[in-house]
């Protein structure tokens, strides 16, 4: 009996030792800030086995090459234009109107902390109802002449999702450039084959930052929560609505859905187009 307990204790110690070694290797093989390093080390140490499951979902970072590709695409044709605009505001005479001075400081703040640039001559419509929003999006898509770029976290295989796909297939068949970027986690349950006919008629569809062979990825971080539509480089949509019947109040358990989305015509569309192109190129 004593020998049995001795074997059990040795096996337990071996498991703990292996878990500790695996935890240290897992955490320190990726560069991260000190707080995150120690937090994950504690999780993996104090919750053997299950801690690694949590890490698979929440802790893994993207490969360095992929992060570098995202960063390079984010700066796509932006730095020079942003620097010119910064200099314009720095050299601008100080306005006498205090309100204008406050706006000037706000613009310069956004330019400095987030590389955001000021755009002008924008006409903006606000939508808080999904039915009105998608009717307008569909009307603009139907009138597209050159390109349709769509990026959503969620595109469901339901009534509104199929209506959108059918319309995109029609436009692609007409020769319009159609590109769809979706998040594989947010659109879980929608197989890549959902877009097969769109591809057959000349359109493109791809999951964000993943190849088709990696459709299932347990990584919950580094997801694409953007909801962007850019049509002909002239009309842009951005906001909170995803593509799904629940966002139109058609699913009883969700009830009426309230969110906010913008339709933009003007200089601001350039920012949406740049964001889409950067995400698309980084995902290829």
List each language-model region with its residue ranges.
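N-terminal localization/anchoring segments of enzymes in phospholipid and broader phosphate metabolism
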Residues: 1-284
């Amino acid at each position: 009996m004593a020998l049995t307990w001795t074997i059990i204790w040795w096996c337990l110690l071996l498991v703990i030792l292996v878990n500790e070694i695996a935890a240290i290797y897992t955490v320190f093989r990726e560069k991260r800030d000190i707080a995150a390093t120690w937090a994950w080390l504690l999780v993996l140490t104090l919750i053997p086995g299950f801690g690694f499951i949590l890490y698979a979902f929440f802790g893994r970072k993207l490969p360095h090459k992929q992060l570098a590709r995202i960063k390079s695409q984010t700066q796509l044709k932006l730095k020079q234009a942003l620097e010119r605009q910064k200099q314009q505001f720095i050299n601008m005479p100080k306005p006498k109107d205090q309100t204008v001075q406050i706006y000037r400081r706000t613009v310069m703040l956004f330019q400095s902390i987030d590389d955001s640039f000021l755009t002008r001559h924008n006409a903006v419509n606000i939508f808080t109802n999904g039915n009105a929003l998608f009717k307008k999006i569909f009307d603009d898509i139907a009138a597209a002449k050159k390109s349709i770029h769509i990026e959503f976290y969620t595109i469901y295989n339901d009534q509104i999702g199929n209506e959108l796909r059918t319309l995109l297939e029609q436009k692609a068949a007409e020769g319009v450039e159609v590109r769809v970027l979706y998040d594989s986690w947010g659109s879980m349950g929608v197989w890549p084959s959902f877009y097969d006919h769109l591809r057959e008629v000349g359109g493109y569809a791809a999951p964000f930052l993943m190849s088709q062979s990696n459709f299932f990825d347990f990584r919950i971080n580094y997801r694409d929560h953007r909801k962007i539509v850019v049509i002909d480089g002239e009309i842009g949509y951005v906001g909170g609505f995803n593509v799904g019947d629940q966002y139109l109040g058609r699913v009883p358990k969700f009830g009426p859905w309230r969110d906010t989305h913008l339709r933009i015509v003007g200089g601001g569309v350039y920012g949406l187009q740049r964001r889409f192109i950067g995400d698309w190129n980084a995902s290829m």
